Amino acid sequence: MQENYKAKAYDILKNLNIEEGDLIEIKKGDLRIRGVLLPSYSKDERIFVIKLDNGYNIGISIDNISEIKLITKNSSKAQESERKEVSRNGAKSEIKIISTGGTIVSKVEYETGAVRPALTTEEIVQFLPEINEIAKVDAEVLFSILSENMKPEYWVKIAESVKKAFDEGNTGVVIAHGTDTMAYTASALAFSLRSLQGPVVLVGSQRSSDRPSSDSAINLLSAVTTAKYAPFGEVVVNMHADSSDTYALVHRGVKVRKMHSSRRDAFQSVNDKPLAKVLWKERKLVMLDKSYMSKKGETTLDAKFDNRAFLLYYYPGLDRDFLEHILTNTKIRGLIIAGTGLGHTSSDYVELFRKATKDGIFIGMTTQCLFGRVNMNVYTTGRQLLDAGVTPLEDMLPEVALVKLMWVLAHEQDLEKIRSLMISNLVGEINPRHTLDLFPRWSYE
């Protein structure tokens, strides 16, 4: 277990029979430092990495250390042995954990302070022995990228890995993913994987796993709980529900959005209720919405995407020539508009849209408001856009509509068939009924 340490640091640990995960005390001058020895990812071979009681990780140079004392051995050795056995044989696992990168599998680079996607899912499991109390897991690192670098071709690889995991006998899948584009991937998987045998749970964290305020551990424990106990066969996002560590929420993958840049409870269901909440301390899943897709017998895979689609966020003063260039001088096959209010753009673009739809380009309308649905029959401009061939997309989120369009374009060439699929509720991306409690209200009392 000292394999992450090299040269002199390795020799010191080996001679004292100290391994990663052991509680140790280091004396350096008048300073005594007690904490758990962590793996070192430092390029400096003379650094020990210690997790303190307050949750912070520190690097300590071996120079001028007068004493290193072993306090207690790692208590999770037996569980670790079981984890290794499970990892060697995926058929023994119940839940597959697929790592794609992101903050939940990131480490701080102590030379620079930067966060890098270097921690594998297996290493997270090593520091979360509680996972074995929930289910037997098997970990796989599919790739290690930051979520802003996600691409449609990666969605295909993730979908294929999920299908393989179910074919191997797993009853649920957890996908560790960066939070910034998690909703895009969740949508892509929802359209690509049908008749799911069990839940597919995307999970991430807003703060890396070596920070004292990290949400990594709770989110991952909650995700495995969801994958183990959920009665549904759907793609979902499992994240913190509040700014403390009370519980997590499970959101339908095509009705969720990251609504804050840094808060741990950044994810919120939009135009829909969360499917469930997870009481992570009790390892308990509480269903909040019974209108879910049940588990099926065999998962089907249909992961194809055509990225000749464009998401346009309309704004006053949008240059007409720029829009015309997109519609006439590129290879675009479809345009999703995030319009104002009930689904509008300036009437200046109506004839551009009319020509584009006549040329076979699909144009769909969503709302920048996010909450609520488009209704283009209310005002004159909306009716003009309808007449020009713009298709209203109900209460679909703009990003979901974009991913859906990419999936539809890969399956259909005919514009009317594309329209038909885009307005069809395939995986719960359209909620036909809105109630008052779907809109969040902020109280200032």
From Swiss-Prot:
Keywords linked to the UniProt accession:
ATP-binding, Ligase, Nucleotide-binding, Protein biosynthesis
UniProt cross-references to SUPFAM superfamilies, sorted A to Z: GatD N-terminal domain-like (SSF141300), Glutaminase/Asparaginase (SSF53774)
Which residues carry out catalysis? 103, 179, 180, 258
Q: Which Pfam families match?
A: Asparaginase, Asparaginase_C, GatD_N
The Enzyme Commission number assigned here is 6.3.5.-
PROSITE patterns, sorted: ASN_GLN_ASE_2, ASN_GLN_ASE_3
The similarity comment for this entry is: Belongs to the asparaginase 1 family. GatD subfamily.
List the protein's name. Answer: Glutamyl-tRNA(Gln) amidotransferase subunit D
Instruction: Please give the organism.
Output: Saccharolobus islandicus (strain M.16.27)
